[in-house]
């Protein structure tokens, strides 16, 4: 007959469980304490983009966002404007749903490493994307571009945003002092790069298809969007579309450009200022910002001041 556990043995088990939990808690706080203030600003700032992506992907796939699915991530910030469920095929919807869950994880990972801040006001309306596309082409598209209309439109809208975060992590990494910070950014960068690669590959498969009703190819859309981001980000080429002049392709030998990179096929870097330039202004100086209507959030006053000096928020 099995011996019943005694009070003493139960107490001993409880003690060891408490010890393990307290050690884990202490280790977690030790990691947070290891992050210097200079790193905190660089880690918090990407939350603006990660929250934007999380809402954009979740609403497109599920018809609801952080407020319904992961409300604690919003930290009481305002709900996004104009975002909606997209008219997607089952295959694309499945991919975007995966992206949404990945972004929830990214937001949680950053918030568990630094204090974070309430979700900023995000404008993900069709009108906001239409303004970006009009700016990219230097004319008013008729009818206005609707990112939620179909697979191609939505993937082109996706092309606008995640790549900015990817290059932002590349730009931030050399400035980070703590190994804990660099480990976090490396993990974020790896998945953001994967998302960007999938989006580009799906669009590259249809690069020569016309986007209706505009009669403009998918490749030309990507080229125009990339040119706009280069303009807004300043400091030369940090972005290339799906089909380029051969000298701009890998090793200067090919026009197909399914992954964007420099002359050595390394990812382009962007500073936080230029990341926000690509997401808040969308060539709308001096009119209202695109996806982040109010000033981006973060704890670096000098950084926010420099962004304002660029007249991009």
UniProtKB/Swiss-Prot annotation:
Q: Does the keyword Cell wall biogenesis/degradation apply?
A: no
- Record protein name field: Desiccation-related protein PCC13-62
Q: Which Pfam families match?
A: Ferritin_2 (PF13668)
Tagged with keyword Glycosyltransferase: no
Looking up InterPro entries in the UniProt record yields: Pigment-catalase-like
A single Gene Ontology biological process assigned to it is:
cellular response to desiccation
Summarize induction of expression: By desiccation (leaves) and by abscisic acid (ABA) (leaves and callus).
In the UniProt record, the signal sequence range is: 1-26
Q: Which UniProt keywords apply?
A: Signal, Stress response
């Amino acid at each position: 007959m099995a011996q019943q556990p005694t009070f003493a043995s139960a107490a001993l088990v409880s003690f060891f469980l408490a010890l393990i939990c307290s050690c884990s808690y202490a280790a977690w706080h030790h990691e947070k304490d290891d992050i210097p203030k200079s790193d905190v600003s660089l880690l918090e700032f990407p939350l603006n983009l990660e929250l934007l992506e999380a809402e954009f992907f979740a609403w497109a796939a599920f018809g609801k966002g952080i407020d319904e699915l992961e409300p604690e991530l919003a930290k009481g910030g305002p709900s996004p404007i104009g975002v909606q469920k997209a008219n997607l095929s089952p295959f694309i919807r499945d991919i975007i749903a995966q992206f949404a869950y990945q972004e929830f994880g990214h937001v949680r990972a950053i918030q568990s490493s630094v204090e974070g801040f309430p979700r900023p006001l995000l404008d993900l309306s069709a009108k906001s994307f239409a303004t970006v596309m009009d700016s990219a082409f230097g004319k008013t598209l008729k009818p206005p571009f609707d990112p939620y209309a179909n697979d191609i439109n939505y993937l082109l809208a996706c092309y606008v945003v995640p790549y900015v975060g990817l290059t932002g992590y590349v730009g931030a990494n050399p400035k980070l002092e703590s190994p804990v910070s660099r480990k976090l950014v490396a993990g974020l960068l790896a998945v953001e790069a994967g998302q960007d690669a999938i989006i580009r590959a799906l669009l590259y498969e249809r690069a020569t298809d016309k986007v209706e009703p505009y009669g403009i190819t998918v490749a030309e859309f990507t080229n125009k969007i990339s040119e706009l981001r280069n303009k807004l980000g300043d400091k030369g080429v940090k972005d290339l579309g799906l089909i380029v002049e051969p000298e701009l392709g890998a090793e200067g030998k090919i026009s197909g450009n399914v992954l964007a990179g420099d002359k050595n096929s390394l990812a382009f870097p962007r500073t936080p200022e230029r990341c926000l330039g690509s997401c808040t202004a969308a060539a709308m100086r001096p009119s209202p910002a695109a996806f982040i209507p109010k000033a981006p959030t973060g704890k670096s006053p000098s950084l926010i001041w420099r962004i304002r000096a660029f007249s991009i928020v």
